[in-house]
Swiss-Prot record:
It comes from Serratia proteamaculans (strain 568). It is found in: Cytoplasm. Mg(2+) binds at residue 252. This is Phenylalanine--tRNA ligase alpha subunit. SUPFAM superfamilies: Class II aaRS and biotin synthetases, tRNA-binding arm.
Length: 327
């Protein structure tokens, strides 16, 4: 089949002349498609004597294979050239500044905890932690809270059984510390606490920070001076502060601390008092030798006052529009 060699030569020439993959595909269709030249060659085998058809068919298939190999080689070359051209056009200028990644930010309550820990750390306080699943002794009994006290009721406390509960305060950390350490003691105890309450100013879980000093000759004057300095530092202004007489089972005398707001109204910020002698006795400390003061404050409450947040629940909804304001 002399004309077959010419057909292969023409096909290879057309393949080499193709300048892109689309043009190359047209060559493939022209020569190898359903109506292509080589398909017509295969159809012409019907005119060849039966004994010669196998040999003639083999020759045509070899020719088709040669054209197919030429097509494949040219396609690879064109695709490689196109890739190199695209890569050259997309060359990265490494001297340009990169895209800056957006940094995350601390949660506003975490910021408050860090600020308070830093302040009291400079006064020699250490940070202590304790279990969130507490027993009634450390959460109530050791703190001079009797069995009939309203805080023990189911509507205020999450109980697991008759003796285990989710702690309602971090005061249990103070009890454990006083049992394990001898005075002088200076600690703060931050952590999550739980109470069965949910509204605009209360959530079932919130963060509390309690502080404790036990040493010889500790007086209410020491308590007032420490908390006054703390509040001025935290709110970054010279505040008008007042101590109102109050009642807590674990302190005597007890007080609630208010600061004067910008609207001319008093705002409650924390509770405090001198450690009750019964609490000291419960942990094996002689109240005739040692005295101390304790204070407790809600982290969300202080954060709301510092940043002007009106709904405590916003701290737990993970709304980025809200949280990004504190970055």
């Amino acid at each position: 089949m002399p004309h077959l060699a010419e057909l292969v030569a023409n096909a290879k020439a057309a393949v080499e002349d193709a300048q892109d993959v689309a043009a190359l595909d047209l060559v493939r269709v022209e020569y190898l498609g359903k109506k292509g030249h080589f398909t017509l060659q295969m159809q012409s085998l019907r005119d060849v004597p039966a004994e010669d058809r196998p040999a003639a068919g083999a020759v045509i298939n070899q020719a088709k294979q040669a054209v197919q190999e030429a097509l494949n080689a040219r396609k690879n070359a064109l695709e490689s050239a196109a890739l190199n051209e695209r890569l050259a056009a997309e060359t990265i200028d490494v001297s340009l500044p990169g895209r800056r990644m957006e940094n995350g930010g601390l949660h506003p309550v975490t910021r408050t905890i860090d600020r308070i820990e830093a302040f009291f750390g400079e006064l020699g306080f250490s940070v202590e932690t304790g279990p969130e699943i507490e027993d009634d002794y450390h959460n109530f009994d050791a703190l001079n809270i009797p069995g009939h006290h309203p805080a023990r009721a189911d509507h205020d406390t999450f109980w697991f059984d008759a003796t285990r509960l989710l702690r309602t305060q971090t005061s249990g950390v103070q009890i454990r510390t006083m049992k394990e350490q001898q005075p002088p003691i200076r600690i703060i105890a931050p952590g999550r606490v739980y109470r069965n309450d949910y509204d605009q100013t209360h959530t079932p879980m919130f963060h509390q920070m309690e502080g404790l000093i036990v040493d010889k000759d500790i007086s209410f004057t020491n308590l007032k001076g420490t908390l006054h300095d703390f509040l001025n530092n935290f709110f970054e202004e010279d505040l008008q502060v007042r101590f109102r007489p109050s009642y807590f089972p674990f302190t005597e005398p007890s007080a609630e601390v208010d600061v004067m707001g910008k609207n001319g109204k008093w705002l409650e910020v924390l509770g405090c008092g001198m450690v009750h002698p019964n609490v000291l006795r419960n942990v094996g400390i002689d109240p005739e030798v040692y005295s101390g003061f304790a204070f407790g404050m809600g982290m969300e409450r202080l954060t709301m006052l510092r940043y002007g947040v009106t709904d405590l629940r916003a701290f737990f909804e993970n709304d980025l529009r809200f949280l990004k304001q504190f970055k």
